[in-house]
A protein has these predicted regions:
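Small-residue-biased structural context
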Residues: 5-139
Length: 139
């Protein structure tokens, strides 16, 4: 398994989604871990406590706030990415309420949130991390 070590592979964060920005990667790792444990919970207990879902959304909101702070500190443009965060939180909260109303299956919800998060990192966070790294290099 030497080849696997080429890119820092952590527990839940796929190597392809490592951004190189430690603060972000640590939080991404934590969020993937939470999603994973919710998937396990959903299968083992055949239920998904609503407070767990709200906790996950709160965790994402905190993570978004961290990224926004990193952008401000580095003076990196964040408008579109920030708008995406606002839109994402609105959609995720809507999905949670559909889950609560029984309109949405919990397994579908967890697959959706995991897929969405992977896409968001690939489409937004990797580019953002690269811009942060650039900004750090520039005096």
């Amino acid at each position: 398994g030497d080849r696997v070590m080429a890119k820092k592979q952590t527990g839940f964060l796929p190597a392809a989604l490592v951004t190189g920005e430690t603060k972000m990667d640590v939080q991404h790792e934590d969020i993937f871990g939470r999603i994973e444990s919710l998937k396990n919970l959903a299968f083992e207990t055949n239920s998904l406590p609503v407070q767990e879902m709200h906790a996950l959304i709160d965790c994402l909101a905190e993570h978004f706030a961290t990224e926004e702070r990193l952008a401000q500190e580095a003076k990196v443009e964040f408008l579109v990415h920030g708008q995406e965060h606002v839109r994402n939180l609105r959609l995720l909260k809507k999905a949670v309420s559909e889950l609560e109303n029984g309109k949405l299956d919990r397994h579908t919800f967890l697959r959706y949130i995991e897929y969405w998060f992977e896409q968001h990192i690939a489409d937004f966070d990797k580019r953002f991390a690269a811009r942060l790294a650039e900004a750090k290099k520039t005096p």
